Amino acid sequence: MLEPITSEHIVSENNSLTTQSVNAEQPAVAKINLLDLNRQQLREFFAKMGEKPFRADQVMKWMYHYCCDDFEQMTDINKVLRNKLQSVAEIRAPEVAEEQRSADGTIKWAIKVGDQQVETVYIPDGDRATLCVSSQVGCALECKFCSTAQQGFNRNLRVSEIIGQVWRAAKIIGALKVTGERPITNVVMMGMGEPLLNLNNVVPAMEIMLDDFGFGLSKRRVTLSTSGVVPALDKLGDMIDVALAISLHAPNDKIRDDIVPINRKYNIETFLAAVRRYLAKSNANQGRVTVEYVMLDHINDSTDDAHQLAEVLKDTPCKINLIPWNPFPGAPYGRSSNSRVDRFSKVLMEYGFTTIVRKTRGDDIDAACGQLAGEVIDRTKRTLKKKMAGEPISVRAV
């Protein structure tokens, strides 16, 4: 059964994004992590210290353009303020627990978040460098083809743990002001977790990605992927404008109810209506959404499925990414053959859809789509139920 979506998963009506105190008078043992603050919050923090707003901009440039986490190195800030910052604040990104490098250049990092881990994937491709970022430890949505979903939901990541993945990757690859080149050109919120179930932290993190004093990415180069949390998608459109990708994976409700269980709450028609509402507000998407469709052998990959998919998407401007399924231990599916993928793709193109078969990257290090699992201390009710029922538990360490 799909775990209920609670207030722990999603922003409430009365909860603002500025949920963390920015009181600079805290004792040293409770230093505020500046990676938790977007630019507006950082300016409020400096105002409480009696400083001008431009000080926030200066510090932010050091943090994100230089990947600097040492106030003493911020040479255009006076010594008195640097000392004050040392006493009340810190710049602390999550650390790398383990690094794996693929033969194709993909890098997967296991990132320490408290006593647990999430995974972040760096995918270089010519002049593009895409970072796949996690938003939660585990996931509540139980998509059957996804390794992360087998863990269940553990907790939401903080802003500093989300933007910290980008910061840490940029630090490793080489900061903009150090190398003269952007270490990361694109960010996709397609790692572990459902981003729309962590809006309070995902949105401020994306604001930092877009901010000129942050990572300065174009809104067309920051992509949020969702499986269809409709109320949160409607909220997203009022909060920020970024590129949208949807994890559809089925041509009809019967199949999607089984493999993407949130469909039982928000069916395809309801989901696509919300997508069109978002597109109507968005400039980042240039009028169309990216549809993600994982190819599962003899589950959703027939030519009849392709015709149904074309029909269901006829009123939703989109491009379609067909994703070869990437196996993980204990999974009940097989990968569609190349011939079935090719036939499926040709049907969609005959209907006029831009259709791309995604190139699998990093599968030799379990960094491909659907393979991210991380190493977690699993406290979920789902795992407890499995233990009590004597069922096998599939949580793969990195």
From Swiss-Prot:
It is an enzyme of class 2 (transferase). Disulfide bonds join 132-369. S-adenosyl-L-methionine binds at residues 193-194, 225, 247-249, 326. It is found in: Cytoplasm. GO terms for cellular component: cytoplasm. Its EC number is 2.1.1.192. Pfam families: Radical_SAM (PF04055), RlmN_N (PF21016). The keyword Transferase applies. PROSITE patterns: RADICAL_SAM (PS51918). GO terms for molecular function: 4 iron, 4 sulfur cluster binding; metal ion binding; rRNA (adenine(2503)-C2-)-methyltransferase activity; rRNA binding; tRNA (adenine(37)-C2)-methyltransferase activity; tRNA binding. It catalyses: adenosine(2503) in 23S rRNA + 2 reduced [2Fe-2S]-[ferredoxin] + 2 S-adenosyl-L-methionine = 2-methyladenosine(2503) in 23S rRNA + 5'-deoxyadenosine + L-methionine + 2 oxidized [2Fe-2S]-[ferredoxin] + S-adenosyl-L-homocysteine; adenosine(37) in tRNA + 2 reduced [2Fe-2S]-[ferredoxin] + 2 S-adenosyl-L-methionine = 2-methyladenosine(37) in tRNA + 5'-deoxyadenosine + L-methionine + 2 oxidized [2Fe-2S]-[ferredoxin] + S-adenosyl-L-homocysteine. Keywords: 4Fe-4S, Cytoplasm, Disulfide bond, Iron, Iron-sulfur, Metal-binding, Methyltransferase, rRNA processing, S-adenosyl-L-methionine, Transferase, tRNA processing. NCBIfam families: PRK11194.1, rRNA_mod_RlmN. Reaction proceeds by a ping-pong mechanism involving intermediate methylation of a conserved cysteine residue. This is Dual-specificity RNA methyltransferase RlmN. It comes from Serratia proteamaculans (strain 568). The lineage of its organism: Bacteria, Pseudomonadati, Pseudomonadota, Gammaproteobacteria, Enterobacterales.
